[in-house]
Regions:
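S-adenosyl-L-methionine
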Residues: 2-84, 195-198
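A short SAM/SAH-binding and catalytic strip from SAM-dependent methyltransferases
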Residues: 117-128, 142-143
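A short acidic, Gly/Pro-enriched loop at the edge of an enzyme's catalytic core
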Residues: 106-117, 124
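Short strand-turn motif at the edge of the Rossmann-like AdoMet-binding core
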Residues: 120-121, 170-172
Length: 212
């Protein structure tokens, strides 16, 4: 960390990622330093009834409302109106586009979004509930394809402006991730009771381009 601080003082115009690369550190040293540079992550846990329309769940809706501003891109909008540019595979939804999410994200210009909302179906059951069997075959292929989700996250990293916000709803707190230059700001855990999985909401800020 001392070497990092010395380099930062000598080259104030360089980004954190550029400094870390210039120092030629091993991956483990990079990760350790990045963690020290990150702000503390705020974690909340609020119970709420489940709903297939994630952004209508009260604590999640309140969180999203705090962050949305400017150009808000939503590749899995369903009935949500938070996005200023919305996409949904189902043509019955009131969205601007009806494309596969990855194809939609690739249409967006680089560093054009202030916020990206990311709430895809993570299981075949979710896909059936959210899309009423529309595009079932394609959805099943995508849900089971981890490479597909990784490519979607790469596109999210590309289209967000520096300091842009990504809000992800899912079953893990992985988010977009450090390697894509994102720092975790907030995690919301929403338990639903019984045997239902918690909904985990991550809020990340784009601080750099890809780190490693």
């Amino acid at each position: 960390m001392e070497k990092y601080n010395q380099y930062k003082e000598a080259y104030p115009h360089k980004t954190d990622a550029q400094i870390i690369e210039s120092l030629g550190w091993e991956l483990s040293d990079k990760v350790e330093t990045i963690h020290k540079l990150l702000p503390q992550t705020k974690v909340n846990r609020i119970w709420a009834m489940p709903n297939k329309l994630t952004f209508t769940i009260k604590p999640i809706k309140e969180l999203v409302t705090r962050y949305v501003n400017g150009v808000v891109i939503d590749p899995f909008a369903n009935e949500s109106k938070f996005g200023t540019i919305r996409n949904d595979l189902n043509p019955a939804m009131d969205t601007h586009y009806h494309l596969d999410a990855l194809a939609f994200l690739k249409l967006m210009e680089t560093e054009s979004a202030d916020v990206v909302l990311y709430d895809p179906p993570y299981s075949i059951t979710q896909a059936a509930q959210c899309y009423n069997e529309f595009g079932k075959e394609k959805l099943e292929q995508n849900v089971a394809n981890m490479g597909y989700w990784a490519n979607c996250k790469n596109e999210v990293a590309r289209i967000l402006k520096p300091n842009g916000i990504c809000i992800i709803c899912g079953w893990s707190s992985n988010g977009i991730g450090l390697k894509r230059g994102f720092e975790m700001m907030e995690i919301l855990l929403v338990p639903h009771g019984g045997s239902k999985n918690d909904t985990i909401v991550t809020v990340e800020r784009k601080s750099q381009t890809f780190l490693f």
